[in-house]
Amino acid sequence: MQCCTTPLSPHEQRLQDKIAGKEDSFRKSHERVFNILDSFDGKRPRIDVERAKLFTDSMKETEGQPLVLRWAKAMKHVAEHITVYIDDDQLICGRGGCPGRYGVLYPELDGDFLDLAIEDLPNRTESPFTITEADARVVVEEIAPYWKGKTYHEDLNLALPSDVHKLTYDDPQGLKSRFIVNETSSFRSSIQWVHDYEKVLKRGFRGLKEEAQEKIAGLDPLSPRDNVEKRPFLEAIVIVCDAIILWANRHAKLAADMAAAETNPVRKAELETMAEICAWVPENPARNFYEAVQAQWFTQMFSRLEQKTGTIVSNGRMDQYFWPFYRKDIEEGRITEESALELLECMWVGMAQYVDLYISPAGGAFNEGYAHWEAVTIGGQTPQGLDATNDLTYLFLKSKREFPLHYPDLAARIHSRSPERYLHDVAETIKFGSGFPKLINDEEIVPLYVSKGASFEEALDYAVSGCTEARMPNRDTYTSGGAYINFAAALEMVLYNGRMLKYGENELGLETGDPTRFETWEEFWNAYVLQHEHFLRAAFIQQHIINNVRARHFAQPMGSALHDLCMKHCLDLHTPQIPEGINLGYFEYMGFGTVVDSLAAIKKLVFEDKKLTMQEVIEALKCNFEGKEDVQQMLKSAPCYGNNDEYADSIAREIDAISVKYGRRYSPELGMHNDVRYVPFTSHVPFGKVVSATPNGRLAWTPLSDGSSASHGADVNGPTAVLQSNFSSKNYGYRDRAARMLNIKFTPKCVEGDEGTEKLVSFIRTFCDLKLWHVQFNVINRDTLIAAQKDPEKYRSLIVRIAGYSAYFVDLSPDLQNDLIARTQHDAM
């Protein structure tokens, strides 16, 4: 616990009040959502096998048929037979699994991991799940055997050339990751996505079904393509629209049955209303705010049942597509701000019960703390370029300040004309201390997307998805998860001539020579460039194969029904190249700050100042600085990224240039944009576990730097210098770049009071002016994190910002907890 003179964030203060047994006035006035929250909060999520079992049963019966038809029929089978639930106190219904927190299985993706996962998941350090003995038997005896030899992961594993395979996997079956050039496509069928929810609210699935039926009627009966490709696609759209309508109607019947048996008149009326709403939406257009929320939730949840899309389907621009319904209901007196907020918070607790499940060990390690990226996007601009904030925008921010839940993720779009009131509310919400909202910059993203082929209207209407990504519904298309590349490993291979201490004499990289014989910085730099490009080569070969393999394994009829280009061309979203679409792919840079600082130290101390020899550096690294602490301190004192120091920042810019130039040269061969991105999720922790000590003074097997953030403790010139280094390290002359995740940690004292709010608003303006992609904040005292480590039960509800999402601190592994504690804590701006 902090000293009484140490300012606490409101989140910390609420937690201390709870520990002290003080009454929570907000809880008292929001009994409904807290009753739901209490039913599952703090409990380990359970694996629910119904979706996997029903999906598998259907796929067994449809072999030989077009994949898109098989998928639609499988979803119809799921809709008919999956158990439907309505939680006590809930006003919004539709879930994909058992009561409480749950995760579902997608055996079509990575079913070859199932046997291993059933044993591993309950005992994992990162994001464990439970499973009943009966469900485990179903998985082992009924689900897994069918998918052996049929999964996407197995196909990919066999397709990779041997030189790429050895950088990707550490075993022939591809069950163990090497954490060097890591493919991520096998634990999600695509990267993050945002549906066009507005289409559902305005037209309903009956309207989408009728569109498909009209297209079927217009097909040329003699055309080979119309018969072989278009007809199965359109028939699948009809089937899947019927499926989600059926699923909603089953909820309507359940609500009506529950209402008939209910003795409490208030709850009886609520259930009757729910029955009426579920019988209307999502089949038909929504008529009011309540129906709009329910229709969106049905769409979102059925999409999650349909496929493992990215790291959960995001919610899009909720303050825009819900706004007409909210405004009309407010004006006509049907709802109040508080009743609307209650509906949204019922949705939030529904989101918090569905937990994204990664059955592969790598997937679990990459997405710690039950990672979730169902981003709700607020603010920004309209397609016409006007400021988009409205009353709902502020309602979402208010909910984040009042309701202590780590769901949903909240992303606030910022632009140069964002209103002062909006920035003030955003700053106050950040100051609350639970990590919301993350900030996304229109001034970087809109022109960048226009340069990649979007119209201004499309780019201005982007929605945040995943960790820091942005999607343009109806224009960009599905892309498989890209490679995560451990460039700190590339640096290590320069030091050990193509080898790594973790993997012994295995020659994984190029033999670039004995670094102790390099006489100039240019020789060392050129060796690094060769290793760097060797990794990029492997990543692009991976992606080329992935693009060809994916369409053989996945279809998404419901997602396709919601995409204009898919319907126009009668092509599934998983089609590698959809006419008029923009395919926004990426590869991930791991250890950016680690590599920059290491190269700066070698250049400065070895080749320029000659204070150390390369031999002395390597000897210190091999013994992990034990007995060589003086060398470690010298290395740490070299210029570092994150301080607005051109010496280090120029190296960062050159490293970035290697990647963007490679992407520009070879992306056209992939038929997509394959751009450099700096968004590690939590993978900088497992990637660090294979990298020995590095020349920036980092100890062996410890986490790498995360995203485009500075190395822990290296950024000593304040947070504005961090922004300036981030700006200086980018190659703005290239469009071949994507998201950059940036973490900043403030003490509550730094942003205390009205003055602190104004300083934070000014900081946000600077972020916007520098055209940086993303920034997110932790506002917390280090002592609170240490206290939570020592007494996790008391701090069960402590929420922190991790990697584009917020999570309960106690749900993180000790390694990730320590990584968060070690982040530089800024106490002044």
Curated annotation (Swiss-Prot):
Any single biological process term in GO: alkanesulfonate catabolic process
Pathway connected to this protein: Organosulfur degradation; alkanesulfonate degradation
Domain of life: Bacteria
Phenotype caused by lack of the gene: Cells lacking this gene lose the ability to grow with isethionate as the terminal electron acceptor.
EC number: 4.4.1.38
PTM annotation: Requires the activating protein IslB to generate the key active site glycyl radical on Gly-804 that is involved in catalysis.
Role noted for this protein: Involved in an anaerobic respiration pathway that converts the sulfonate isethionate (2-hydroxyethanesulfonate) to ammonia, acetate and sulfide. Catalyzes the radical-mediated C-S bond cleavage of isethionate (2-hydroxyethanesulfonate) to form sulfite and acetaldehyde.
Assembly with partners or alone: Homodimer.
Protein name, entry field: Isethionate sulfite-lyase
Native source species: Oleidesulfovibrio alaskensis (strain ATCC BAA-1058 / DSM 17464 / G20)
Gene: islA
